[in-house]
Amino acid sequence: RDVLGSRGLGDVYKRQYHGGENLEEQLSEKELADLKAKELDILVKFDRMCKENNLRYFITAGTLLGAVRHKGFIPWDDDIDVVMLRKDFNRLNRVCSKALPEGLFLQDKKNDKGYPFHFDKIRLDNTEVVDPFLEGVNMHKGIYIDVFPVDKCPENNKLAQFMFKWVSTTSYALIAKQNKDFDFDYTKKSARMLYHFMIKMPRGFVIAMRDFVVGIFNVFCSGKKLCTVSGAHGFPRETYKSEWFEEKIMLPFESGEYPAPKGYDSLLTNMYGDYMKPPEDDEKSGHFTSVESDK
């Protein structure tokens, strides 16, 4: 049995708020089209900044799947996901402080004291997306793209599962510190104890403990196996072979081309299985219930 379990952040999120019975709460076609246009504009500016500052990134998850299967957004998808290898991700804050275009905001643990997650977001100022999962959390809630770090991952599955669950549990605790109605009933006693312990600790302590564990694995793991430990799909679907990221390939996405891992076929197969087969209608859902602009 695994130590703490292995679900990703997105598993709880989708189960609580985005089952088929809640599809009527999602965005209208016009709202979705407007949201995608703004997200794409963020991606274009992010891509330009990365090129000008020698930052490597790759499209991933639903964005990568959309590029391969649709040459753009998955029709019902409402977000953009990119990843950076850890060495590039660690430069992102410094680069953004000097080069991020006006009107955009790098949301990370340093720039937004209410932000609970282990990954970053590039937010659009003067907008807001209503995300039920983050109700009560005091932070910038503008339209965004996700930027996930890719870390070294233990080759031992039990340790890898621990790494995933450590990050998700500490992140949930940071949400619960702000939203007293938020709770997750872990089935494993060890995870439940960690969750309730972390809720009582100061924010800085929780983040330091989260970063410490991830940092230890980055120091001592071989690097043959990588992972997006804060991704939506959890272990083992967000684990990769390092050679998948050794080279990039440009793939069409909407009106442009964006870098993807050369091993994208293996990545998508691991994440989605038969990824060229569209899901059933009751599995088609997005993240948001409404979008506001020009706040």
At which residue positions do the language-model features occur?
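Active-site nucleotide-donor binding segment shared across nucleotidyl transfer reactions
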Residues: D47-I80, M84, F89-N90, E243, ...
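A short secondary-structure junction signal
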Residues: N156-F162
